[in-house]
Amino acid sequence: MRASIPSLLFRCKRSGRLTLMALALLGQARATELPLFLGAPLPAVTSNMAHVACLPPTDPLELAVWRVTTAGGRPDLSCGNAFVEYQRLPRSSSAPVDAFDQIAAQIREAKSEVLLASMEWHAGEGRPGWTVALAVRDLYARVQANPAAYPQGMSVRLMLGNFPDLQRADWATLPLALVRDLRTLGVPLQDAGVGWSLSVLNYRYFPHSHVKLHVIDGRDLTVAGFNFTDTHLPLNERNGGLHDLHDLGLRMTGPVAQDGVAAFDDLWRHSRQVRCPGDVRPEQVGAACTLGDPDRITHPAAATEAVTTGTARAFMLHRRPGVDQADRAHLSLLGAATTQIDLMQATFSPLLTCWYAYLNPDECTYDTLPVYLRAVVDAIGRGVRVRVLMVDYGIDTAANRSGAALVRLMARQLGKEELFEARYTTFAMHTKALAVDGRMVLAGSMNFHFSAWGSLGLAEAALATSDLAAVQQQKASFEDVWANGSRPVPREWWMRNVASGSAATPADLPVSRLSHP
């Protein structure tokens, strides 16, 4: 549904999205399509669902997330999974093969289907998007050389997030740049002779999609926080001040990958697809290609099977406007914590009106906090230790400082300030990961930022698992950064005037005079 500019402003003022909306107003009217009345996402359509039998989990953390992901009778694909690896950026001595090269290797080895979604995309030789384009070229060459090895053909679906675009009225600059790279490398969109089908899509709504995930053959799922952008590369002439940006993706195999397919399909259903003449040359892409309705959703038969690969529990979480599953799962997991929460969150911020609360916190009381910060305060109130790693540069500087200040304030009011610790990383970080009680880890695209939550928040994805190796590896990474790559967030001067223990529980914390006259 489309909406007028005045109505957009009204909605955005009410929801606290005015900053985001300003970007949309710079575009043409036809690019400001709102995601209204989309309906619920469809569940995974798994061809062998009758053979997938997951018993309800007994671990309280698993159970907290499971109750959300299976609500409403949605299929349970949480059992029989296996942790593969974390895909990390940037390249380093501990990660000599970076996530971009790992993903390229996965694409080259695909047997029937590649699904990949990213918000932002930097195309052109030597850039992360080019790494993917080269892998798709190599995959096409393999299919072309030996079609018999791919009896169900090869389907490649690449989806971008409709990131705000000031160059074209249809916001198609990034997907068309991706198509241009593919055509430069000689990759066709269709080659029926060998069963090759390549689609490039762009999410159609504002707010945009922030989802970063890829699924290979319906069996191998990675959910990540990084875009295919130069900021994750070493310093070069393109990335200027922001470079070597740290981030990660969590890779699992097993039935949970089918939930990843369902999340991708939900975005596909709400996207536009690039349409080009069959013989379009690279230099013609911008003028000759257009965006239209997407093809009907189909998958190779082999990519619709849920295949058991291990014994781990894993939970695919997804959200977009009108769908709050990932919100509820995050809150349920945090609400089940009993001992410790470790947050590696680039953003840890309150609502926009409280971004400068570090100067004066009086109007930013417990009841004005966004739900994710309230969940953190509630955990502290239960006696849970909370540690947070965040950044202190760019637009997040004041917001994160205020988020830490407000949580510390309320922890002191609860008489439990010692349970909250916050540190700034000494490097550029884009990570969105958390660990709970040393038994479950979650990673993905979802920031502790108002834009990622609520009825008009971005489309997001996350993956959670209780696999011991996954939990231990993230714990080791967190502890290393905590000890060697961070510095304390200082207490604000006014904290000396805050009495300790003035509230017995979060329910006893002060509330806003404006909302409670």
For the regions a protein language model found, what residue spans apply to each?
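Residue-level detector of transmembrane insertion/anchoring sites
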Residues: A3, L18-L20, N202, A422
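Charged, low-complexity intrinsically disordered terminal segments
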Residues: T32-P517
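N-terminal secretory signal peptides that target proteins for export/translocation
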Residues: M1-C12
